[in-house]
Amino acid sequence: MQHIRNFSIIAHIDHGKSTLADRLIQRCGGLAAREMSAQVLDSMDIERERGITIKAQTAALEYKAQDGKVYNLNLIDTPGHVDFSYEVSRSLSACEGALLVVDASQGVEAQTVANCYTAIDLGVEVLAVLNKMDLPQADPEGARQEVEDVIGIDASDAVLASAKTGMGIDEILEAIVARVPSPEGDPEAALQALIIDSWFDNYVGVVMLVRIVNGVLRPKDKILLMASGATHLCEQTGVFTPKSQPRAQLSAGEVGFIIAGIKELAHAKVGDTITLAGKPAAAPLPGFKEVQPQVFAGLYPVESSEYDQLRDSLEKLKLNDAALMFEPEVSQALGFGFRCGFLGLLHMEIVQERLEREFDMDIITTAPSVVYEVVERDGTVLTIESPSRMPEVGKIAEIREPIVKVTLFMPQEYVGPVMTLCNNKRGNQINMTYHGRQVHLTYEIPLAEIVLDFFDRLKSVSRGYASMDYEFLEYRPADVVKVDLLINGDRVDALAMIVHRSNARYRARDVVSRMRALIPRQMYDVAIQAAIGAEVIARENVKALRKNVLAKCYGGDISRKKKLLEKQKAGKKRMKQVGTVEIPQEAFLAILQVEDK
């Protein structure tokens, strides 16, 4: 066990984490030269394309150090994005060390800071690596200073490296051997293994990536998953070098995979503890929590006949994505579909993109909404995921909305516009610090304001230089109201929205005027109204198409013309009583595109 080193890599998107992993694998001879491809560990197309890591991956490498001993290095590649922060914390808790990779030309970014603090909280030894030293604009001194100022770890002995050219790779490996502590654990004790990640394989079922903390696991052992209480027979154990290689056993301190013929991913939850059914451990490992979706949206097939196909596609996605939740939902306007819960906006985009790309589905997505807590007059607390489920105004004592803590980093010339944006989004400034040219802002902002378009607006006001990261804080009472849209007096459930009262009239007027442009003219007047409860706060009319009934009257008596007009009016009134208005698809999308002024 003295020769095992478990470490992971923390980096912001595009700071060279996956390329560095490739170099380390190459240097330790993990893959033959012909099997090397760029970003070996990012196995999904969408991961390579977007340049992000979604699922955790591992590689067990053998490295002959300068002191002549052979060390087993286990590299655990973590996702870097804020939506997957729970997966990051599980990956980090399986390690004793972490490489903090910082782009020497760009300095520290928000997500790096968040993940680095997670690592420090878990007691992981952090080694700084300044990457991309081959770039002409690299500034190692500035980056080193920033790491010390912003994160507060000693960067005087940071390794200068370039994953692209291969410079500094040996120094990194030596630093890992010298500075990362070897794992603690007792191979004799009862088995405790942490599930770092799990995914579904079409041939063998669920594959679990685990870190053995105590004890030994061999094939044919009967295992117990402590959170779900399920028991399974362990069929195969092994390690990834990134290719899978079976091993006769996994013992304390090692990282490897287990196949136990589990059919459903929901049984193998990330962060759960595995122990032996015959000789269980006294307590599970700390830190397990159920992942709760934060953002909800409705997904509907464009062709209602594809409903079953959409359900199958979502079920297949769920096999590999335990955080995705969905339940059937019916909307008067869009027909049958699903209400889906996601970890955050990136997660939502990825699910949509995978549905379109891997399953060839055409889908419509309704506006993302967040979960509100509603306290009724009699004291019951409801969680509301969709505006159509909000109880009547008279029954509500208070509504609480989720607040998130947002960390922002940007060059100082963009502080003004970014602060204006945060204040417009009902943000509350908590902190502001200067680190050289970079500014670090902390805000508390309602999640509902962030899910609409905060990220895009942030990138545009800062010309792409600002980076953000957010974490859920708590629910707080808020003055939010449900705005219903009525067409000719009928409520349209799919168009309802929950907005802050101060913003309600503006939003209502804007949506109503957009709807007016989109609903085609009928043979009678159509009234589009927005209402809070019974109070109408905005209205537009779509004028009727009408025939000129006076065309045949030349001169003559006025009463003749009156009679014809009255007759036309009565006819239109009858039509209005029986007619229904078709709402085109674009009208639903109009609701999504309303900007808050």
Swiss-Prot record:
- Supply the alphabetized keyword list: Cell inner membrane, Cell membrane, GTP-binding, Hydrolase, Membrane, Nucleotide-binding, Protein biosynthesis
Upper classification of the source organism reads: Bacteria, Pseudomonadati, Pseudomonadota, Betaproteobacteria, Burkholderiales
Question: Where is this protein chiefly located?
Answer: membrane
Question: What SUPFAM superfamilies does the record tag this protein with?
Answer: EF-G C-terminal domain-like, P-loop containing nucleoside triphosphate hydrolases, Translation proteins
Q: Name one GO molecular function term.
A: guanosine tetraphosphate binding
An example GO CC term for this entry is: plasma membrane
**Keyword flag Membrane:** yes
Q: Which residues bind GTP?
A: 14-19, 131-134
For this protein, the Enzyme Commission number is 3.6.5.n1
Q: Where found, per UniProt?
A: Cell inner membrane
Task: Note whether Phosphoprotein occurs among the keywords.
Answer: no
What is the protein name stated in its UniProt record?
Elongation factor 4
Q: How does it sit in the membrane?
A: Peripheral membrane protein
* Catalyzed reactions: GTP + H2O = GDP + phosphate + H(+)
Gene3D superfamilies this protein is in? Answer: 3.30.70.240, Elongation factor 4, C-terminal domain (3.30.70.2570), Elongation Factor G (Translational Gtpase), domain 3 (3.30.70.870), P-loop containing nucleotide triphosphate hydrolases (3.40.50.300), Translation factors (2.40.30.10)
Identify the domain of life. Answer: Bacteria
Task: Say which species the protein is native to.
Answer: Bordetella avium (strain 197N)
HAMAP family, per database record:
LepA
Purpose: Required for accurate and efficient protein synthesis under certain stress conditions. May act as a fidelity factor of the translation reaction, by catalyzing a one-codon backward translocation of tRNAs on improperly translocated ribosomes. Back-translocation proceeds from a post-translocation (POST) complex to a pre-translocation (PRE) complex, thus giving elongation factor G a second chance to translocate the tRNAs correctly. Binds to ribosomes in a GTP-dependent manner.
* InterPro entries on file: EF-4, EFG_III/V, EFG_V-like, EFTu-like_2, G_TR_CS, LepA_C_sf, LepA_CTD, LepA_IV
Q: Which NCBIfam families match?
A: lepA (TIGR01393), small_GTP (TIGR00231)
**Which SMART domains does the record associate with it?**
EFG_C
